[in-house]
Every structure is written in C-alpha cells, then in structure tokens.
C-alpha cells in the first residue's frame, strides 16, 4: 500500500508505520487477525498505556449500567456526588459529561505543563513536580477545586478529561462497587481477554478514568471488534446495540458542536458522543494522546489497533498521518 501523507508526500506502509512512531499495529478483518507487528521491544503480551482510549471503556460501561437501570443518563452527576453542587459541575448531567459538552472550566492543553490536565494527573503520581503541600490529595478533591464554568451546559463541545473522572465517581456511588471491578465483570471477562489489564488509581482507589488503563494490543482489538459487532462478542450482547447505534449516529447538534471546536477540522463529518470519536457514519475511533488508536470501520468489517510513542502528546501532523494510515489500511484490506 502506498499512502499520501498530510504533507502531500507518498510513503510506503512500512515508512508510514515508522514515521508515526508505532509500537504495535494489528488489523482484524471479519474478526480474524490478518496483520500483526510489534516494535520497540513490544510483543503480543506487552501492556501499553492507552491514555484516553480508557474513556471509551468508561463510555461503554456507562451504557451497560444505564441499560440495567443503575442510573438515567439525563440525571445530574450531583445526584450521586452531591459534594459537586458547589462547583462547575453543578448542572452537569451524565450525558453532558459523556459528550464533553458540560459547563466546567478545565484547561486541557498538553503542551502547557501547568494546565489543569497535568494538575489532575499529578494526583495519581504522573507529575510529581506539580505536587506540594496544598495540592489535592484525591481525584475528588481535585474535582471539588474546579469552581468556574466556561459555558452553559451543552453549549459547545470541549474535550476535558476530568469529566470522565466524574463519571467514575458517579458509577461508584450508584453501584457501591469499584469501577475496575465493574469493568472486569461487565467487559473484560466477557471479551475472553488474553491478559489482565491495569489501571492507575488515586490513594482512595478511584481510577484515573480518563487516561489510566494499560492493556495488550490483542485485547484492545477484541474491544474494537465488540463495538464493530454492535456490542456483541462471541454471540453475547455485552453493550446494548442501541447504545452503539446512538453513539455512531449522533445528530446534527453533535456535529455542529464538534465542527465549531478545535477538533472540527480533523473529522469534518464527525462528532464526539459517549466517550467515542466518530469520523463518519461508518468509522468510529478510540483515541489517546501520544498516538493510541482503535479504528473501527463498519463498512469494511475491519478493526485496527495502533499503539504509539509520539515524542509529543498531541502532535497534529503525527495524528493526521496516523488517521490517514488507519483509514487507508481499513479501506484497502
């Protein structure tokens, strides 16, 4: 396969893999592995940090629990976490948290070492240089420190990882169970996974739900295949089909909010819903900083997992070329 990159140059598949700092690349076609390669000392058993692909697991878990009647996604998060009443989350619903359309002011600019994202990451030990005696000690303490709002609820789409942390709090309060145990019971075990997954937690055991999961490449492919199959895996319905359909289709409001955002140019027909990226009606993605992606192409029956180690968290050229690579491969095999 020859691929035209974002700069207009033609590259071979092999060169594109190398230039986008790939650690592993796996292609499923109709549920079968047709390509699998590992780089940089990775192997099929290796766990890799998936960053914000973690969010997509959380989104699917919310769909499962909502279907079981644990909560209604129209409900405010403060019903379950009343401590948040006096914060920027006071009017946030489970749905607006899922869709990154909530009101809370939160800066997520990975190139700014003092932004809110890195301050939250510091709570779980990712940025020890940002920790001092006055720093929040738990993820809940951090959320309670966010008092301001940057918009009205559902006014616009703005990607903020802390909203996924709040979803984790809601899940734990509504179920009286740990998020990691629920992920294991409702998703991980049902995918017949090869390896255990690992998730980063704060001192209370609450997971860093927006970024903290680690898993092997093949197990992420299983997750992608389940989404491709409308929520089923090996004939078992894991996530309600209606949840997958609703996520994929969105509506004009979702697309308008996305088009006006910083991410709009990336996917002109796209939207973001239920912690999933949707490029168009056929292609869905789970995406994490430093180049982590699950690409799901409904039209061609392909799932591609690409783990990467970009030099910078959100390099627009590298992400653009990665998305071109994934779309080209998924439409060619």
Task: Show where each model-derived region lies.
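Active-site-proximal alpha-helical segments within enzyme catalytic domains
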Residues: 100, 163-170, 211-232, 292-308
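N-terminal leader/targeting segments and the immediately adjacent pre-domain N-terminus
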Residues: 1-43, 98-99, 103-105, 140-145, ...
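Active-site SXXK
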Residues: 31, 49-73, 97, 167-171, ...
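Catalytic-site signature segments of enzymes, centered on catalytic residues
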Residues: 44-45, 109-112, 120-206
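Active-site helix/loop module of the DD-peptidase/beta-lactamase fold
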Residues: 49, 67-109, 145-148, 174-211, ...
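Active-site Gly/Thr loop motif
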Residues: 194-197, 248-303
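Structured C-terminal helix/loop/strand segments within mature extracytoplasmic catalytic/sensor domains
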Residues: 283-333
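A short acidic/small-residue loop/turn micro-motif
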Residues: 39-43, 47, 310-313
């Amino acid at each position: 396969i020859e691929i035209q990159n974002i700069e207009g140059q033609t590259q071979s598949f092999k060169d594109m893999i190398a230039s986008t700092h790939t650690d592993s690349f796996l292609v499923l076609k109709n549920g079968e592995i047709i390509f699998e390669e590992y780089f940089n000392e990775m192997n099929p058993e290796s766990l890799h940090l998936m960053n914000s692909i973690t969010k997509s697991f959380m989104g699917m878990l919310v769909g499962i629990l909502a279907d079981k009647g644990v909560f209604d996604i129209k409900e405010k998060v403060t019903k379950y976490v009343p401590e948040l009443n006096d914060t920027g989350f006071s009017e946030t619903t489970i749905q607006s948290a899922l869709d990154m359309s909530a009101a809370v002011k939160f800066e997520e600019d990975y190139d700014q070492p003092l932004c809110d994202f890195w301050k939250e990451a510091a709570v779980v030990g990712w940025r020890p240089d940002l920790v001092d005696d006055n720093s929040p000690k738990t993820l809940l303490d951090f959320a309670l420190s966010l008092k301001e709002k940057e918009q009205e609820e559902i006014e616009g789409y703005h990607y903020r990882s802390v909203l996924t942390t709040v979803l984790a709090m809601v899940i734990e309060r509504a179920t009286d169970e740990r998020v990691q145990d629920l992920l294991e019971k409702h998703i991980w075990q049902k995918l017949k996974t090869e390896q255990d997954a690992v998730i980063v937690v704060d001192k209370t055991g609450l997971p860093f739900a927006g970024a903290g999961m680690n898993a092997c490449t093949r197990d992420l492919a299983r997750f992608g295949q389940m989404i491709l199959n409308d929520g089923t895996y090996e004939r078992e319905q894991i996530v309600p089909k209606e949840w997958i359909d609703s996520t994929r289709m969105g509506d004009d409001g979702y697309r308008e909010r996305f088009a006006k955002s910083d991410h709009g140019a990336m996917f002109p027909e796209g939207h973001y819903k239920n912690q999933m990226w949707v490029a168009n009606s056929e292609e869905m993605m789970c995406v994490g900083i430093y180049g982590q992606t699950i690409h799901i192409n409904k039209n061609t029956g392909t799932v591609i997992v690409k783990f990467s180690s970009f030099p910078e968290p959100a390099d627009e050229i590298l992400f653009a070329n990665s998305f071109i690579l994934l779309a080209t491969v998924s439409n060619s095999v």
